[in-house]
């Protein structure tokens, strides 16, 4: 069968890429081997435009948030299930300095639509320096969203659950051939781990391990709380607590160190006897050395693209950046400054060039 696009991977990036291609009436196929543990499947689903550490907006934070909010709201309708909704987030200040910094920005032009001076009152939370509430915050039930996307595309014969190897791809004139299928373009959305034959294996993607706790507590409020860690309500009196960030640990298991780190942070605002641990999970985020996404064209395989490297902000970034990549491919529009994968072309060696020539001949 002839397709316009092959999408490799059905995590957050691949799912959103499929939904964006659907808007453009493109013929596409998503392939994914359905690994049990991925960063997308254990993602907490928190979305907001802020970097709390310095009380600044993330890179293009408000623009990305506004577009993503519209995108996921529409997805609720398309997928016939509400997996996304706006949800109040309260920042518990860690010092009077942070409190003053927040309040000084509330009425400024840059933050007037993002920060609120409203303070919430909590009976069971240690909150000596006060708190502030975001005007823009939301959560996505990532597991349910991915499941719904898979079902949606299975019904349209746009999804196959199978493993993928670049060794099975051959060049057939203008097209890429996989089995009996032909594709004009390939978009790799595979997360942090590449096999040695992947044409984008030259890129400096850094797996960043994150671990979360699932806890139960009758004392936590039905708000997203942030103070060193986040607490996100899920169902009834259950919450997700997270997350850790570790570039060095590549072990595929949960760790005691991560559990202790999360407990030490949550105890700063919630006494340990006020909650119990139900479960612990881990995943690996795809991060980059300059903390910017990896989006764009392969140096020599001109119809091969990558959509990756969004780390813990894929829920925030992927909708708008996915739209930009599709418009870049179809209409030759420019990508956002700083995300184009061409900034790492100097990593592409003669050895990588030889590998790519073997893959497509």
Question: Where are the regions a protein language model picked out?
Answer:
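Active-site substrate-recognition segment that forms the wall
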Residues: 13-24, 46, 51, 82-85, ...
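Dinucleotide-binding Rossmann-like beta1-alpha1 core, especially the glycine-rich loop
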Residues: 45-124, 128
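Short beta-strand to alpha-helix junction loop
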Residues: 55-67, 97, 132-148, 253-258, ...
């Amino acid at each position: 069968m002839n397709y316009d696009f092959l999408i490799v991977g059905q995590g957050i990036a691949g799912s959103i890429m499929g939904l964006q291609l659907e808007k453009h009436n493109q013929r596409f196929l998503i392939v994914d081997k359905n690994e049990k543990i991925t960063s997308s499947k254990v993602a907490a689903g928190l979305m907001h435009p802020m970097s709390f550490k310095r009380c600044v907006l993330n890179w293009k934070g408000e623009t990305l948030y506004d577009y993503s909010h519209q995108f996921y709201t529409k997805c609720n309708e398309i997928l016939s299930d509400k997996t996304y909704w706006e949800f109040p987030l309260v920042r518990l200040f860690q010092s009077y300095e942070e409190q003053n910094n927040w309040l000084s920005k509330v009425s400024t032009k840059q933050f007037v639509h993002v920060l609120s001076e409203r303070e919430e009152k909590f009976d069971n939370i240690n909150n000596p320096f006060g708190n502030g509430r975001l005007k823009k915050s939301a959560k996505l039930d990532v597991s349910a969203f991915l499941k719904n996307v898979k079902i949606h595309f299975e019904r349209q014969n746009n999804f196959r659950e199978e493993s993928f190897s670049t060794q099975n791809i051959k060049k057939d004139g203008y097209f890429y051939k996989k089995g009996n299928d032909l594709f004009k373009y390939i978009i790799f959305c595979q997360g942090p781990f590449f096999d040695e034959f992947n044409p984008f294996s030259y890129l400096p993607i850094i797996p960043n391990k994150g671990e979360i706790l699932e806890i139960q507590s009758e004392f936590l409020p039905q708000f997203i709380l942030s103070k060193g860690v986040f607490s996100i309500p899920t169902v009834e009196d259950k919450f997700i607590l997270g997350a850790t960030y570790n570039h060095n640990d590549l072990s595929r298991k949960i760790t005691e160190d991560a559990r202790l780190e999360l407990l030490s942070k949550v105890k700063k605002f919630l006494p340990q006897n006020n909650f119990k641990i139900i479960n612990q999970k881990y995943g690996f985020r795809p991060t980059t050395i300059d903390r910017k996404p990896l989006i764009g064209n392969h140096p020599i395989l001109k119809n091969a693209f990558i959509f990756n490297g969004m780390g813990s902000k894929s829920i925030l970034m992927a909708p708008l950046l996915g739209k930009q990549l599709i418009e870049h491919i179809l209409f030759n529009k420019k990508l956002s400054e700083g995300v184009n994968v061409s900034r790492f072309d100097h990593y592409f060696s003669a050895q990588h060039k030889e590998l790519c020539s073997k893959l497509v001949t």
